[in-house]
Amino acid sequence: MPSEAVLGQELLDERRTETRRYKLRFPTREALEASLAIEAVGGAVAVALPERRVISLDVPAAQVSFMAESFEAARQHYGAEIVEDYRYSLEQLDFYNPLAFAPEGEAQQSLDDVIEAIGAPQAWSHSRGEGVVIAIVDTGIDGLRPEFPHYKRHPRSWAANGEDPWTDWQGHGSMCAAIAAGTRSQGGEFDGVAPDAMIMSCRTHFYDTELAAIYDELTSLAREGATVIASNSFGVQSGSPPPVPADSDFIPALDDAIAAGVIVCFSAGNYHHLAGGTPDGHEPNSIWLHKGRSDLLTVGAAKPDGSMWYYSSRGPGQFPGQPLTSPKPDLVGITPPFGRVVYGSNVSVLKDGWGTSGCCPQAAGLIALLQSKRHAEDEPPLSRDQLFDVIRKSSVSLGHHGHSQGAGRLDCEAAVNRI
């Protein structure tokens, strides 16, 4: 039977689906602090960003009209600007659908096979990720899974007010964490790419303000001297170019984190078929928004046989040729059909693989191996540009157009041997 804590978390998650999230931006920090009494009249503060002069409120759907008076008071008395908090989509296939999962007996390959195919075990003689923090910006991580023992959990793991980062509201975040840095050391079923890396769970519902708060925390860690890698598997689920989100705090926070030295990986997206692309086609473009930036690594998805997954988003990115962009994806990971992997509290078999979501943490784990090797040799960490150059140049071409595969399939052994 689920514990009371688990049941309470499930109720919280259910309540989240019945709320609206609003962002309130104030002219000064003092105005923000004075306004927090608004919580007493129907809204619960989910995130506070005092340095950015922003709070976000969860408002039960039934109370939205009631809150109009309170919002108007916030405008008049505190100068607040009020907008609905932008929400990104979980980078998923149809993981909410039970038909996306298959019985254990239908498994063709598992995470072990993927780890072997990308050369991670061969790299472990040089490095296993020690001394590096991998932040999993996702749906949380199931702390009951033995792949995530307490000694691997970063003490500054993050969740919105009232939530626990070591619970997973969907299952997806546990999958990404296991791929990047799960361990068998305490009875886990799988090792990830970097099994000795520290894991920082950053549990989010993908609201702009939550992502800003997470990246502000990652910035602080990096400025304090931590080696931080962020794995992100969310985006905008669309077959056509989405508009740039207005009034974003996440993008400025992302800028700050990258400037502070956080190495950022993003899944390319699972939108190629939504854009009308054929499985073997390298167009049209379906990599959206910030995933085209040159200062982050964008990762697509191939099958173990080297063919591209039908859904893996193709480049070159939404804003090709603009300043600070580069052709995308940078590379691909691999994910098997009917692949067996941690998903939430269970080990499950996913018919259509793990999406680009399951490939992004492979790249994050590889970066952890590279930086950890530098630590072990008493050498300074590689710069972002050095890391990306090593990873691209050591990747194995699968024979596809660059808009599909980038530089090719990542190779942990070759990358570690290159530095």
Go through the PLM ranges and name each one.
Residues 8-26:
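Short glycine-/aliphatic-rich beta-strand segments at the starts of folded cytosolic domains
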Residues 180, 200-204, 335-405:
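Hydrolase catalytic cores
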Residues 183, 202-295, 326, 345-361, ...:
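Substrate-binding/access-modulating region of protease and related hydrolase catalytic domains
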Residues 39, 76, 128, 255-259, ...:
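Anion (oxyanion) recognition and catalysis
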Residues 138-140, 146, 286-372:
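Extracellular S/T/G-rich loop segment that most often corresponds to the catalytic His/Ser-adjacent loop
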Residues 3-4, 12, 32-114, 121-122, ...:
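Autoinhibitory propeptides
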Residues 122-155, 163-210, 225-227, 259, ...:
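Subtilisin-like serine protease catalytic core
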Residues 26-27, 85-86, 137-140, 179-183, ...:
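Active-site-proximal beta-strand/loop segments in catalytic clefts of secreted hydrolases
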